[in-house]
Amino acid sequence: MLEVNLPGLQLKNPIIPASGCFGFGKEYAGFYDLSCLGGIMIKATTNEARFGNPTPRVAETSAGMLNAIGLQNPGLEHVLNHELPWLEQFDTPIIANVAGSQVDDYKEVAEHISQAPNVHALELNISCPNVKTGGIAFGTDPVMAAELTKAVKEVSAVPVYVKLSPNVANITEIAKAIEAAGADGLTMINTLIGMRLDLKTGRPILANKTGGLSGPAIKPVAIRMVYEVSQAVHIPIIGMGGVQTAEDALEFLLAGASAVAVGTANFVNPFVCPEIIEQLPRVLRQYGFQSVSECIGRSWKHEKQPAHHRA
């Protein structure tokens, strides 16, 4: 009922913790068996270790949070020698998030990390809003996005998914350029750029001034973008942005996503992913669906039937 097959990814269910909200899984392994997850999107990995942005770099908002972590990570060598081998104990495919400042940085990380035995796909991070070079610079220009995608595809041993930024005028144009460059799938959306001010000082709360807005506040934006992009491309989408419940996950599937990543909600409730997995079959049946594949893109597909007419 819950199985989903995507390029490189045979998922037992469509629920995946999102990169940047799950580390490398060690904190959450103390709460539940990570083998129950459809997959795991690990923390963004760069060639060299990064300390990230100065603090403060997290701020709560009324319906989510702002972060300006700045791709803090232990670097490629550490991830290959320690984090990925530790994750081999779990029966779930790993999606490695690859980041960098230049095309060669991405290629270096992609070539090596894609050869790890438990890495089944790459997530190309071209949409981080909190770094000064690389990151979102690639994700806001269709030509640059396509060139980077093509370069990484040439060296990767596994399928490549590209993470899209919502901070663009036309996300569909970016998506189509990335598809044409050979991407195997898309993940979307990354965070929206936002800011909070300290009323006492009149200054931005975050040391970076701006940060990425995530959580329930961005879900309507994410749903709209998945809905639009899924009709314009022929590669699968892993949807994300404000997912907290099985009902939220179903909404993304109906919009056109083939799987769903859960991000900020992990900070609020460490059990959120297994809870959604447990509740999803009931929610699917409640709305007349017998499988995940049956409801993907249902909101826009022309051959629509009322739920009570389906077998």
Curated annotation (Swiss-Prot):
Q: Which Pfam families match?
A: DHO_dh (PF01180)
Q: List the disulfide bonds.
A: none
Question: GO CC annotations?
Answer: cytoplasm
Residues bound to FMN = 19, 43-44, 97, 125, 163, 189, 215, 241-242, 263-264
The entry's keywords: Cytoplasm, Flavoprotein, FMN, NAD, Oxidoreductase, Pyrimidine biosynthesis
Task: Tell me the protein's name.
Answer: Dihydroorotate dehydrogenase B (NAD(+)), catalytic subunit
Name where it mostly resides. Answer: cytoplasm
Q: Name one GO molecular function term.
A: dihydroorotate dehydrogenase (NAD+) activity
Relay the cofactor remark from the entry: Binds 1 FMN per subunit.
Residues annotated as binding substrate:
43, 67-71, 125, 190-191
E.C. designation(s): 1.3.1.14
